[in-house]
């Protein structure tokens, strides 16, 4: 199969039909809710916290709260009390089965649950999906991942997932491919394409996006949403620790499988990086919106569907 990544692809424009890029609609629907953009900040401890999740929800952006040292029940109740969408992450450990029971018992069923482990094509994920479905029926939208193959996508959908996350290891602070030899680093976009061809439910591109134009490329290859890490790191609202170097303020961010997040040096597959503080995340979201509107105008349409229909070229050499 042809292997390529974001830098290897350029989209080919169609005739523009709008008078202004502002006419282009960037909204995207996932489950029962529609959001301003088809993007979501990564569910990592240095990317999102309770306060930022609330701000995003109030402004009609999708979020997924991370699962590390968070009182999930308190978080869900707080968001429900404020009439905001509830979106959390779960792993597959025994305590998280108990948490599912507690959610049901306390009538705190969230709108979205993301089952979030490094290798999502696993029996442990199948068992968790089955348990959530048994307890919560169709009251919750289940996102599961992460996976990289069409077979994995088919299995997750068959097991009951409503959407799947695609990637292993292309993120800037992920070192899975270096530690294990496995991953989609260097061919993430083609992995997305081949998985999307098989999928009958939404696909979420997770990681490897470095610039705003990569959102349009992901949509062209079949993504319904894009989970983004580095582009959403180091903002004023970001929970990462501030570090001063040579009179410049940086914020740190690290992978969920890093020793900094796990607080132990076992099965480490992530690292830490510093990024100079960028300003408000809502300024970035505004710029991202404008850039995506431009992408839609180049695609010859008025909404995201136009991007899915454009042709593209592969640049230079690629592996076949």
Curated annotation (Swiss-Prot):
The keyword Transmembrane does not apply. GO terms for cellular component: cytosol; GMP reductase complex. Belongs to the IMPDH/GMPR family. GuaC type 2 subfamily. One of its GO terms (molecular function) is GMP reductase activity. The active site is at residue 174. It catalyses: IMP + NH4(+) + NADP(+) = GMP + NADPH + 2 H(+). Keywords: NADP, Oxidoreductase. SUPFAM superfamilies: Inosine monophosphate dehydrogenase (IMPDH). NADP(+) binds at residues 203-226. GO terms for biological process: purine nucleotide metabolic process. Its EC number is 1.7.1.7. This is GMP reductase. InterPro entries: Aldolase_TIM, GMP_reductase, GuaC_type_2, IMP_DH_GMPRt. It comes from Mycoplasma mycoides subsp. mycoides SC (strain CCUG 32753 / NCTC 10114 / PG1). It is an enzyme of class 1 (oxidoreductase).
């Amino acid at each position: 199969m042809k292997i390529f990544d974001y830098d290897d692809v350029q989209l080919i424009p169609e005739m523009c039909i709008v008078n202004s890029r502002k006419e282009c609609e960037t909204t995207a629907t996932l489950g029962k809710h529609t959001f301003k953009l088809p993007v979501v900040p990564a569910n990592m401890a240095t990317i999102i916290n309770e306060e930022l999740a609330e701000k995003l929800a109030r402004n009609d952006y999708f979020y997924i709260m991370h699962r590390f040292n968070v009182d999930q029940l308190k978080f869900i109740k707080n968001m429900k009390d404020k009439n905001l969408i509830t979106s959390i992450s779960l792993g597959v450990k025994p305590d998280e089965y108990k948490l599912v029971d507690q959610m049901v018992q306390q009538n705190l069923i969230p709108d979205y649950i993301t089952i979030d482990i490094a290798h999502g094509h696993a029996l442990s994920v199948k068992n968790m999906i089955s348990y959530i479905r048994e307890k919560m029926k169709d009251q919750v939208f289940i996102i599961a991942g992460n996976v990289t193959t069409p077979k994995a996508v088919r299995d997750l959908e068959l097991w009951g997932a409503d959407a799947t996350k695609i990637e292993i290891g292309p993120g800037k602070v992920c070192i899975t491919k270096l530690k294990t030899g496995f991953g989609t680093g260097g061919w993430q976009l083609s992995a997305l394409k081949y998985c999307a061809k098989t999928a009958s439910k939404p696909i979420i591109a997770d990681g490897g996006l470095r610039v705003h134009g990569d959102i349009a490329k992901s949509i062209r290859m079949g993504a319904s949403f894009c989970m983004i890490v580095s582009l959403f790191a180091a903002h004023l609202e970001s929970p990462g620790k501030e570090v001063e170097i040579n009179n410049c303020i940086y914020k740190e961010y690290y992978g969920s499988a890093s020793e900094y997040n796990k607080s132990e040096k076992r099965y480490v597959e992530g690292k830490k990086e510093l990024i100079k503080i960028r300003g408000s995340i809502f300024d970035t979201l505004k710029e991202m919106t404008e850039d995506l509107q431009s992408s839609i105008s180049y695609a010859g349409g008025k909404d995201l569907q136009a991007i899915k229909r454009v042709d593209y070229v592969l640049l230079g050499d690629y592996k076949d």
